[in-house]
Structures are given as C-alpha cells and as structure tokens.
C-alpha cells in the first residue's frame, strides 16, 4: 500500500485525501462505490484539487448514466474537453458498454479501426461474453495513452461493473483463441475464397482482425500492469454510513485486494451533524445510526485515510460549489459549534 499521511499528535491516519495529492507518481485514480453515494461529486472535487498540483488532469466518466456534464453544467462527450474555468483540467464521458456497435458500423462501411470485419466482428461479439466492453475499453485506453495527461481520474459505474476492466485481458485472450480456432477450422475453405490481396470477396480479412485484437490486447495488458502498481494507481472508495453501502465497500475492498490494486482512502459522504438539544427526532435518530456505522468503518479500516464529509443543504453542482466541496477533501470538516 502507498504511504498515507500520519497525524503525529494521535498517531491516526489523516482524515483527508492529501496523501493522494502528495503522491506525485500516481497516474491512474479510480473513484467508485455503490450507486447514489456521491462518487461523481467526489471524483470532480478530487480532480479540482489535483489540477492545483499537477500539470494536466483528465477526468473520465465510465458510468453509462453520465453525471459529469450535470456536475459542471457543461456538455461533455467522447472527446476530451477543457472544463470551463480551468486551464489544465479536462473531462470526457465514454460508455464502455456498447461501442462494439459503432465498431461494427465502421466495419460495414469500410472505415475506422474495424474496416472490413463486419460480420466476423458480430460473430465474435456474440461468441465471447464481454468482448464488446473489452475492445471499447481498450480503444479508450489507447486514446488516453496517446494524450499527455499527467493524471487520469475515472468516475466509475456503480459497484459490480467497476472492476470488469480487470477481466478484460482474459476476455481478449479468449477472443484471440476463438479467432485462431476459426482460422484453423475454416482455413482450407478460406484459402479457396481468398483473393489476390489476401481478403475475402466481401473485404473481410482474418489476419487483419487478429492483428488488431493483438494490438488491443497488448495495450490493455500494459495498462493492466500499471493498475497493479501502487506507485501508479490507487482506488478511492466512496460510501455513506449505512449498512448496504458499508457492505458494498467491504466487498469492493476485498476484490481490489485480490487483484492487487492499492486502496487506502475512503470518503464517507452525507454525514449529519445536528446541534445539541435539536428537537428534530429524525435527524437525531439518523445521526445515531450513522455514528454506529462510522465507528464500524473506523474500526475496520484503521489503516485507511477516512474522510468525513457532511450532508449539505444545497446540491453540489457547478464550479463554485464543487470547489468549496473539494476543500473539505483536504481540510477536515469541522461541524458548527454545538454540533454532535
């Protein structure tokens, strides 16, 4: 695990994300958790803080229900675009689920990276579960690698989909094996159909497809290796102090550990701090429940930086509110006088 900041006064890990800002070697940062816990707000806020201490930062949403555009009140798409008001912070929204359709569209039209492989691509997509996500994710990584961003932050899909990319090298290996099997099985028949340029009459080319798959596999294997390097990659878990969210967080941390991916920070959102003597029974009851789960989080993850974020009265949208929220990720929130 990466070295986290220690508070020497009480020998507790500092309750901030300052350790991530201080670790200059980090290239990939993933922000994930259960749906509705504030992942996007947290990833946007972390990106804002990182932009202050990095040459260039890219924020990527891989959640099909994209929220970056809403968070910054600015439309983003598949191409990286500078966020208004920043000179070194860009964002893009991609959908790792379904871009195989686009790839197949290019194949049928005879253009793009899949030119001349339409029917074969479709057969392959149906033959191997997950190949569409694997190939589209690999294409995204190729694009990101060609750009010169110092740090890349992923605002991920809800838990369950978040770690699929870890299986992609295996999926692509299966794809290559399938293509190889097709080549062996139908080789003699294909030889009789091949034209002078080594292509089928309809323009499909088996060798071309294998080369492209191999190229994607190499790209994703290289990045996958970087993901397992604690000097280059870390995962920030986001949760709220409730049973299901805590359960999902524990499951995710266990899974990250099994894939050797570093994680040492947890952001706990939506904390209530009712004033002493408050006559709001619901507030007090909820705070009591939150306190119980917060104590469990601190006990379970005593080697983590646990960041406690308050429930705010206003929605965190727009540059100014995100900047204000982001300050609390690096300066511990202090409840108003009289808060519990």
UniProtKB/Swiss-Prot annotation:
UniProt subunit comment: Homodimer.
Similarity comment: family membership: Belongs to the arsA ATPase family.
Keywords for this protein: ATP-binding, Cytoplasm, Endoplasmic reticulum, Hydrolase, Metal-binding, Nucleotide-binding, Transport, Zinc
Gene that this sequence comes from: get3
Keyword Kinase included in the entry's annotation: no
Ligand binding (ATP): 34-41, 242, 269
Entry binding sites for Zn(2+): 280, 283
Entries under Pfam families matching the protein: ArsA_ATPase
GO molecular function, one term: ATP binding
Cited SUPFAM superfamilies: P-loop containing nucleoside triphosphate hydrolases
Localization in the cell: Cytoplasm; Endoplasmic reticulum
Source species: Botryotinia fuckeliana (strain B05.10)
Principal location class: cytoplasm
Residues annotated as catalytic: 63
InterPro entries (UniProt xref): Anion-transp_ATPase-like_dom, ATPase_ArsA/GET3, ATPase_ArsA/GET3_euk, P-loop_NTPase
Gene Ontology process terms (BP): cellular response to oxidative stress; pheromone-dependent signal transduction involved in conjugation with cellular fusion; post-translational protein targeting to endoplasmic reticulum membrane; response to heat; response to metal ion; retrograde vesicle-mediated transport, Golgi to endoplasmic reticulum; tail-anchored membrane protein insertion into ER membrane
Segments traversing the membrane: none
Biological function: ATPase required for the post-translational delivery of tail-anchored (TA) proteins to the endoplasmic reticulum. Recognizes and selectively binds the transmembrane domain of TA proteins in the cytosol. This complex then targets to the endoplasmic reticulum by membrane-bound receptors, where the tail-anchored protein is released for insertion. This process is regulated by ATP binding and hydrolysis. ATP binding drives the homodimer towards the closed dimer state, facilitating recognition of newly synthesized TA membrane proteins. ATP hydrolysis is required for insertion.
Any single GO CC term annotated in Swiss-Prot or TrEMBL for this entry: GET complex
Presence of keyword Cytoplasm: yes
Name recorded for this polypeptide: ATPase get3
Main enzyme class: hydrolase
EC number: 3.6.-.-
Organism superkingdom: Eukaryota
